[in-house]
């Protein structure tokens, strides 16, 4: 545990009966950063959040906040706040009373509460909403009230449990921008849970991908996407086409087509058989090329800002996303050209 590790889970296991849902997990979050737990349903991400909050107790292992062992501490003694998916607002209270409820429970004076509630509502762009009620504001505004209620307490750690799931696409975008802006401005150490990759990438300093109670990879979003460390990660983090290939120094061969991959060393593989992952945006079609680059177009769907294409290359499907101006939907055959930035290598599995 380094001096800058603010939230730490050490060898944490959680079992419900014989079912192990968190398996000897080690996790550390630096002070003032936002880390997202991302994974499919049932991977254990929400259980980790509940363990950090004190809503569940680990079967074994320890949890530290700011150097203090809080494994056996109640949620009230952890200096943590949670922003829930359901907002969890009191409909019979005004917005001001909802935001100030935690302060009231802490015995903060009425005058100080009013001041801090005003400041919190200004932070989430709801200045002057103190006297309104829950049924008088929109879903997006309700989520901002829930965020203000957490921020007003100035917690050591802020937890987000899929907070944007109930919002439509446009509101999700604006709310994730607001959450990220406030987290960076206030420097609150934060743990965020979602199953939405776009959301995770937008709000996080680092993303932790979980599967079956284990951490598969922890890295900034760009590294996760461009350098996944397993076939599971490659398939989970966006679309890709996976081919059997070979590596010889910086030369990669797929379907008989050999090309140079200048960044091959970063994948840590030895020469020989490998898996070659190709992101759909890394592929372009040309009218000329080697015989090994030739492919046939199976389908093409216009998606507005790009064409979504499935090509047959060497008897295997190749997924391609290309600019509308750079693709002719009448095309039947073409030659595959690869951009290095969207190619990654994996050990054979």
Swiss-Prot record:
Protein name (database record): Fe(3+) ions import ATP-binding protein FbpC
Membrane topology according to the record: Peripheral membrane protein
Family matches, as InterPro entries: AAA+_ATPase, ABC_SmlMolc_Importer, ABC_transporter-like_ATP-bd, ABC_transporter-like_CS, ABC_transpr_FbpC, Mo/tungstate-bd_C_term_dom, P-loop_NTPase, Transp-assoc_OB_typ2
Positions of disulphide bridges: none
Record lineage: Bacteria, Pseudomonadati, Pseudomonadota, Gammaproteobacteria, Pasteurellales
Location of the ABC transporter domain: 7-237
Enzyme Commission number, as recorded: 7.2.2.7
Predominant subcellular localization, coarse grouping: membrane
Xref: Pfam families: ABC_tran, TOBE_2
Residues where ATP binds: 39-46
One term of GO molecular function: ATP hydrolysis activity
Similarity comment: Belongs to the ABC transporter superfamily. Fe(3+) ion importer (TC 3.A.1.10) family.
Reaction catalyzed: Fe(3+)(out) + ATP + H2O = Fe(3+)(in) + ADP + phosphate + H(+)
Subunit composition and interactions: The complex is composed of two ATP-binding proteins (FbpC), two transmembrane proteins (FbpB) and a solute-binding protein (FbpA).
Localisation: Cell inner membrane
Top EC group: translocase
Domain of life: Bacteria
Role this protein plays: Part of the ABC transporter complex FbpABC involved in Fe(3+) ions import. Responsible for energy coupling to the transport system.
GO cellular component terms attached to this protein's record: ATP-binding cassette (ABC) transporter complex
Source organism: Pasteurella multocida (strain Pm70)
Keywords in alphabetical order: ATP-binding, Cell inner membrane, Cell membrane, Ion transport, Iron, Iron transport, Membrane, Nucleotide-binding, Translocase, Transport
């Amino acid at each position: 545990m380094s001096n800058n590790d603010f939230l730490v889970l050490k060898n944490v296991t959680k079992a419900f009966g014989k079912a192990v849902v968190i398996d000897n997990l080690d996790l550390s979050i630096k002070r003032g950063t936002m880390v997202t737990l991302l994974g499919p349903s049932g991977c254990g991400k929400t259980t980790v959040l509940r363990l950090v909050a004190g809503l569940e107790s680990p079967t074994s292992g320890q949890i530290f906040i700011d150097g203090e062992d809080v494994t056996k501490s109640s949620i009230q003694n952890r200096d943590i706040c949670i922003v829930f998916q359901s907002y969890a607002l009191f409909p019979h209270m005004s917005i001001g009373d909802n935001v100030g409820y935690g302060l009231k429970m802490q015995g903060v004076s009425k005058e100080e509460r009013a001041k801090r509630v005003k400041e919190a509502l200004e932070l989430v762009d709801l200045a002057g909403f103190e006297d309104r009620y829950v049924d008088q504001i929109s879903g997006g505004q309700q989520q901002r009230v829930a965020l203000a209620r957490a921020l007003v307490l100035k917690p050591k750690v802020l937890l987000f449990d899929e907070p944007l799931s109930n919002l439509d696409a446009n509101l999700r975008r604006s709310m994730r921008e607001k959450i990220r802006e406030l987290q960076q401005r206030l420097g609150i150490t934060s743990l965020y849970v979602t199953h939405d990759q776009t959301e995770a990438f937008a709000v996080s300093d680092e993303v932790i991908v979980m599967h079956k109670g284990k951490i598969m990879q922890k890295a900034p979003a760009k590294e996760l996407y461009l350098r996944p460390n397993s076939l599971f990660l490659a398939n989970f983090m966006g679309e890709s086409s996976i081919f059997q290939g070979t590596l010889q120094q910086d030369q990669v061969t797929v379907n008989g087509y050999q090309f140079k991959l200048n960044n091959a060393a970063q994948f840590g593989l030895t020469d020989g058989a490998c898996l070659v992952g190709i992101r759909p945006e890394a592929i372009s079609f040309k009218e000329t090329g080697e015989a090994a680059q030739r492919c046939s177009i199976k389908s093409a769907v216009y998606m507005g800002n790009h064409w979504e294409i499935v090509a047959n290359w060497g008897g295997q499907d190749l997924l391609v996303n290309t600019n509308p101006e750079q693709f002719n939907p009448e095309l039947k055959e073409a030659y595959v050209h690869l951009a290095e930035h969207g190619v990654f290598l994996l050990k054979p599995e």
